[in-house]
Amino acid sequence: MEDFKQSVNTYSSEGRIHQIEYAMKAMNLGTTTIGVRTKEFVILCSEKKILSTLQNPKSVVKHYKIYDHIVLGFSGISGDTKTIVKRSRDFCISHTHMYGENISVERLLKYLSSLSLRFGEEDEAKMIFRRPFGVSLIIAGFDTEPRLYSLDPSGSYISYKAKAIGSGHEVVEGILENEYEEYSGLDQSLRKVLCTLSKVMKDKISKDNVEVVVVTQEESKFLTPEEVSVYL
């Protein structure tokens, strides 16, 4: 039984791959990230875990720009995320050079889904890690319309109107289910998503311990701490 629990590419007698289940648990240990999609924009809002007053808040990054119209947020092992970000950026650039067009958000998701399942490759040149990714991702983008997806370590991805990942995801998703219809204008939506995030944060919310990005048809705008403070 222990062999099944250690193996990354063997099913147990119950039809489970335990290493993927462990990765699914790891992704919920990180700070909370919220994604909300409307007809005009997508917002990503994340808690930044500041461990010391001596720490530079700018050194903690929760959102990464993958391409002009695609942003990634995560919860879980940050080192895994950096590998995913690099691979994603390279893939998007390659797609544009090959086809002469911006990549669609779902095309990137399909690539990431296949990438997440390459942990058991015998060919080391193809293998990314020797274990599943220990992160859950939220992808916000705008191609023909606003897009919001979540991808878990099993390679499964789903489109959402609103989604939360991380340690506070259950509480946040309960709030989003009841209040999603109240998200309309950008200013109101920013205030609302920050208020929701504050309810699952151990520390008092401030401009330095949250990160916010807004994706529209025109741009992916990362709000400065001063801009965030306006909505707190």
UniProtKB/Swiss-Prot annotation:
GO terms for biological process: ubiquitin-dependent protein catabolic process. GO terms for cellular component: cytoplasm; nucleus; proteasome core complex, alpha-subunit complex. It comes from the Eukaryota. InterPro entries: Ntn_hydrolases_N, Proteasome_alpha, Proteasome_alpha-type, Proteasome_asu_N, Proteasome_sua/b. PROSITE patterns: PROTEASOME_ALPHA_1 (PS00388), PROTEASOME_ALPHA_2 (PS51475). Keywords: Cytoplasm, Nucleus, Proteasome. It is found in: Cytoplasm; Nucleus. PANTHER family: PROTEASOME SUBUNIT ALPHA/BETA. The proteasome degrades poly-ubiquitinated proteins in the cytoplasm and in the nucleus. It is essential for the regulated turnover of proteins and for the removal of misfolded proteins. The proteasome is a multicatalytic proteinase complex that is characterized by its ability to cleave peptides with Arg, Phe, Tyr, Leu, and Glu adjacent to the leaving group at neutral or slightly basic pH. It has an ATP-dependent proteolytic activity. The 26S proteasome consists of a 20S proteasome core and two 19S regulatory subunits. The 20S proteasome core is composed of 28 subunits that are arranged in four stacked rings, resulting in a barrel-shaped structure. The two end rings are each formed by seven alpha subunits, and the two central rings are each formed by seven beta subunits. The catalytic chamber with the active sites is on the inside of the barrel. This is Probable proteasome subunit alpha type-5. It comes from Encephalitozoon cuniculi (strain GB-M1).
